[in-house]
Amino acid sequence: MGIFDALYTGVSGLNAAQIQIQTTGQNITNADSEYYTRQRVVQVANEAFHTKGGDIGRGTMVQQIVRVHDEFVFGRLTSSYSNLEYTSYKEQVLQEVNQKFPDLADSGILENIKKYFAMWNNYASHPNEAAQKTVLIDSANVLMGNINDSYETLNKIRDSVNDQLILAVNEVNDIARQIADINKQLQRTEINTRINSNDLRDKRDALELRLSKLTNINSFKQDVSSNSSFDDATIYDMGKNYTLSINGITLVEGENFHEIKMDTTHSERGYSTLFYELNDETRIDISSKFTGGKIAGMLDLRGRYMTSDGKMRDGILTTYQDNLDAFAKTFITQTNSVYASGAVKEMVSDYLKDAKANTTLQNYDNGIKDGDITVKIYNTQGNVVAQRKISINASTTLNDITRGNSIVQDFNKNLDDNNDKNFNNDIDDYFKAVYTWDEHTQTGNLSFKPTEKNPTGFYIAIEDNGTNFAGTLGLSKFLDGQNASNIRVNEAIQADPALLHGGKSPQPGDNSMANAMINLQNVKLPFNSRTGGDRDETISGYYRYITTQMASDTQSTMTQNATNTAINTTVNAQWQSISGVNMNEELSNLMRYQSSYGAAAKVITTVEKMLSTLLELKQ
């Protein structure tokens, strides 16, 4: 052990203090850098020189420079960001939906419904006035148009969510690819345990935080360890092995990246399904794996799964649209069922898709219920000259009696409806039921038209007793369409308002059908939503249910988002207290390391004087 060893002791202190100052300066200059993690120098004593009298110190050394990073708190931070972005995105979209459905006192669909039935009331009071017909049709057009617009608004919002989903998934793939590249760089730069690529790990953490805002993630970093060299350092991620996954679906495995893929071929609106492709090219639908972040919010809103015909079968916005469809369908069916009780010269149904002669009515449309209809024949004086009840049940078909009764067969039976022992003045003598099927278009058509022997001046009407038969098939209708996207006033009535009638009989001045239409607003009707469930409500009541559900969903999401915001703020503060730069602390450290540097320099100057003294003795 010589005097030069004492010189090296001072030099080691000088070098260590210099690195401490450089590291502290790095912290200070990056105090405002987003995602920067403050660093600390791990300084240890050099191995001592062993003598019989005891160990003699040989100075100090910098073992490594580490990030002040707590992996456990960082995991909580990514989780809190996932939860916050999930509810924040949902809140943003749901608030937009609520703005489109204001239903204020003097505007909105509820007010349109009220005015629509008020116009029916005015028409019932003046059934012979042409102007009242025009006003009623105009009122109906406003209501139906607003229903169409509301449905299309939801379509546009859902389309926008899907477009954003595509961008978000592409961003996830891009971030995951960057993380894999960083892992490759870490393998090259961290060639031994003393070299820490802190900046690369900061970049990877920043990418993880970005990714956590898009989706829920789980990162596994092997060789995570604890270091208690100083108070504010706890759990480190110093290992090279790295796996990033979404609920078990691996995105990054070391240097390898696995892409999330999208497919739009099975959707009628070009919506993307998310899948994961295995090595054998097997596709796995991973929509259910996304439970946090914006992507989960998007999927919850738009829907995750599709039916075989390309429609979304879940999703908040999908439910709203299905509820609007249920509202419109019941409105159409019930309105047309009432309107069909008004006498007309003939009845022709809509084109019935896939309804063959042997198709049961309830298989064609589950809105048709058990019950019966009463077919009535009127003369020009408004008197009923014949009537017949036809039962409808689960086995009733359009024109096949193999398993039960059929509409055509029951209508055309030669019966004595009037019980006058005359078989020539009954329903089948005045009108004939015909069902035609087009094999090419796969559509059918039901009609009730005058028989050849029927003299002019007779009219047919169908009064419904709970079956919804006439309204569902579109026999003598006031409204066209099947759902909220295409509900509208019958084109023929639209073109010629004179065709509108208000009575059940053809007698001028009869307002009995119009009165029945007015009463429809007070009756609880069945509404069957594909995803929203079944309810019995009045027309206004069901629409109010739709808007109340929208408001309730929005309020619930806002409450969840407020909670997640508070949690994220707390966790972020904890994270900043550990990994963020505290300027006062760094300035204090700078003064301390500056003092250490001066003290080490003093050791060197002292040894230098010792050497000078030694050299003078030699002279």
Which functions belong to the PLM regions below?
Residues 1-619:
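Structural signature of extracellular appendage/secretion-system components
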